[in-house]
């Protein structure tokens, strides 16, 4: 992932907050906290995986530099993006009564305006217009999810 200069500065500042020794390194055990400070929400399993599955004792002894940390952040961000699409589609699949990849526009309207991060009526209508309902008032939810998450 290519980070903007602003994002790199933001990451550097967060990294330095955890760098107790001022040597430009942090302990493996701090990486998860830095990722979370930067707005990510990885599971402990995700963090362990991105660290290369180190033995537990290395978490408090082995260190990483900022240049080693950035690719870890990029990997977690990629996972998050991928996960959210899968999660979204999975959540909408519940409403796919006929198992044909489509849900009723009315149901989708209800879901978007009442669950999770609620959207305003205008946002819902605009999103549904982009989702192109078929003549039966159904929307292909996988395509719609891609549209919605890619903005």
Swiss-Prot record:
Limits of the EF-hand domain: 6-41, 83-118, 119-151
Family annotation (SUPFAM superfamilies): EF-hand
GO molecular function, one term: calcium ion binding
Modified residues (N-acetylalanine): 1
GO CC field: myosin II complex
Gene3D superfamilies xrefs: EF-hand
Protein name: Myosin catalytic light chain, smooth muscle
Record-linked InterPro entries: CALM/Myosin/TropC-like, EF-hand-dom_pair, EF_hand_dom
Task performed by this protein: In molluscan muscle, calcium regulation is associated with myosin rather than with actin. Muscle myosin contains two types of light chains: the catalytic light chain, essential for ATPase activity, and the regulatory light chain, a calcium-binding protein responsible for Ca(2+) dependent binding and Ca(2+) dependent Mg-ATPase activity.
Keyword Transcription regulation: no
Pfam families noted in UniProt: EF-hand_7
Keywords: Acetylation, Motor protein, Muscle protein, Myosin, Repeat
Transmembrane segments: none
Statement: the UniProt record of this protein carries the keyword RNA-binding: no
Organism: Halocynthia roretzi (Sea squirt)
